[in-house]
Amino acid sequence: MKAIKLITAAMAVCFLALPVWAEVKIKEVTSPGGITAWLVEDHSIPFTALELRFRGGTSLDKPGKRGATYLMAGLLEEGAGPLPAQDYARALESLAAGFSYDADKDTVSISAQFLSENRNRAIDLLRQTIHEPRFDQDALDRVRAQVLAGLRSDAKDPNDIAGRVFSQMAFGDHPYGTEGNGTIESVTALTRQDMFDAHEAVFARDRLYVGAVGDITEAELGALLDTLLADLPAEGAPIPGPADVTIEGGVTVVDYDTPQSVALFGHIGIKRDDPRYFAAYLLNQILGGGSFDSRLMSEVREKRGLTYGVYSYLVPRDLGAVYMGSVASANGKIAETVEVIQTEWAKLAAEGVTEKELADAKTYLTGAYPLRFDGNSRIASILAGMQMDDLPIDYVATRNDKVNAVTLDEINKVAAEILLPDQLHFIVVGRPEGLQSTN
C-alpha cells in the first residue's frame, strides 16, 4: 500500500535507536478522557513517534465488500477536512512530518512521526485524517486503480497464488480465507459510501492500542490522546469469531508456466497466548527459522542443493493460527524437496532437538532481540503490538529470561504436540515433475 513518508534529512536522525534496549522504561499513561497508551520518553532529540493500532483490520469487511478496509486505509492520505489530496500533502510536507497507514487481516495501523515544534499542528492534521477523511471520488478512483494494478500483478505471482490458495483451504468462508486487498471484482464494485462504512467499522475506542516514543511527557501525551482520539465512537463493528483451520494433509498442484515451482506448506499452528509459545518459537528457529543452521536449510539446501532458501514460521493471528513454511525449487527438483521437508518435519516431531541445538537457538534469539529496537518508530510499533498481544508491560525486560527458561524436555514435548506431519499440506505452484495433487 502506498503511504506518505515525507521524512526530511533533518528528521532522519530522529530514527536513531534509544541508547540501550535493556534500559527502555515503559510507562502506562491514561489520558483524562480514559485513553490508555504505553510511553517511552526520550528527550535527547526533539521528535516523537506515535503508533495507533485498531484491532479487526480487513476481517471487518462486510460480505461482498472484500477489499473495502484495505482501500479505505489507502485513501486516508488522500485528503481530510477542508484539504483535498494535494493540499493535504503540502500541509504534511510543511510540517516535516510523516504519516503512514496500513491494513492487514487483524489490524489497521497509523504511524506518525513529527518534530516537537510542530507537534500540535501535526496532531491537528492527523485528527482530521482520523475523524474527517474526505474519500473524494477522484482520489477513490486513483487509489482503486493502484489496488487493481496490484491485484493483476498478484494474479501472476506464484507466491501470491500459493498464498491465496492456502488461505482458502485453511480458513474457508472465514475472512481469513480470502486476502484483505480483495479481488478485481470486489474492488471494482466498491463505492464511496463503502469507504465511509469501512471507516466507521474500524475507528473506535474499544479496539484501540497506542504506543509513543520520544520527546513527550506523560501529561503532554495524555492531552494529545484526548485531542486526537477522545471523540471516537465507543464501539466499532463486531470482530469475527475464531477461525477453524480446516486444511488437511496432502499436496495441491496449481498449474503455472514457470521453470521453478513455489511451494507454501503448513498446518494448524499455535496462538501467541499459548503457554507453549516460547518453546514453539525456539523449535521453529531450529526447524527453519531463517539461519543457515536450521534443519531445513541444512538438509534441503546445504546437503542436496535443492533450493537457495527454505523457511518455516509461526503465524499466530488473532483469530486462528497456522504453522507455515515456504520454498522454491526447479520443477525437476521440487518433488524431492517436498519429500525432504516432510521427512524432517516428521523426524523432529518424533525425535526432538538436541541440547546443542536448543542452546544455539537460545543464543541466537536472545542476541537478536535487542536489534529490534532500532529506532523510535520501531519501538512505538513494538509497544502497540505488545498491548495487542496482551503482554505485560515488563515484557521487554523479561522476554529473554522466558526464552532461556525453556528446557530440553519441554521443547521436545512441544515438538511432538505441534508438529503434525500427517496434516502438513503443500500448495505447489508451477509445473512440478513427479508431483500431483492428492485431493
Residue ranges and their predicted role:
Residues 38-39, 46-49, 59-62, 273-274, ...:
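Short, solvent-exposed loop/turn elements at domain surfaces
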Residues 24-26, 51-113, 156, 179, ...:
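M16/MPP (pitrilysin/insulinase) zinc-metallopeptidase core fold and M16-derived inactive scaffolds
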Residues 18-22:
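Sec/Tat signal peptide C-region and signal peptidase I cleavage site
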